[in-house]
């Protein structure tokens, strides 16, 4: 890996300085917690966190679980609008070549997540796609998925 260095301000960008720097601290936008043994656990980006049914849900944990299923080549977890709950967890999934999209597979994946973590974290919506939107460096563009979802509604 590479060392990350932070300068004392953004060059010619006062709005970004005001957003990121508060009381002498740089706010990265990453969220983590410390467990009872003193270990830190990465939850995810603040802008990617999902607030659903009163819980804060990080996409990384659910994505990691789904990636263990043999049908999942890659996936992205985002929030989707829900008329009753406000927001729900949505999984956008690219399948491996031996699997085809189906309601049965979606249900299997939902149950797979339920068995591996707290039941409230399971994706209530599963969408199968051919590919996920990515940056040039290969990072998934969750913001683009959310934007596409809001344009559909």
Each predicted region: which residue ranges?
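Conserved ATP-binding loop and adjacent catalytic segment of the adenylate-forming AMP-binding
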Residues: 7, 22-24, 153
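General small-molecule cofactor/ligand-binding pocket signal
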Residues: 126-129
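Acidic/polar alpha-helix N-cap and adjacent early helical turns
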Residues: 147-153
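AMP-binding/adenylate-forming catalytic core of the ANL superfamily
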Residues: 3, 8-9, 16-19, 31-120, ...
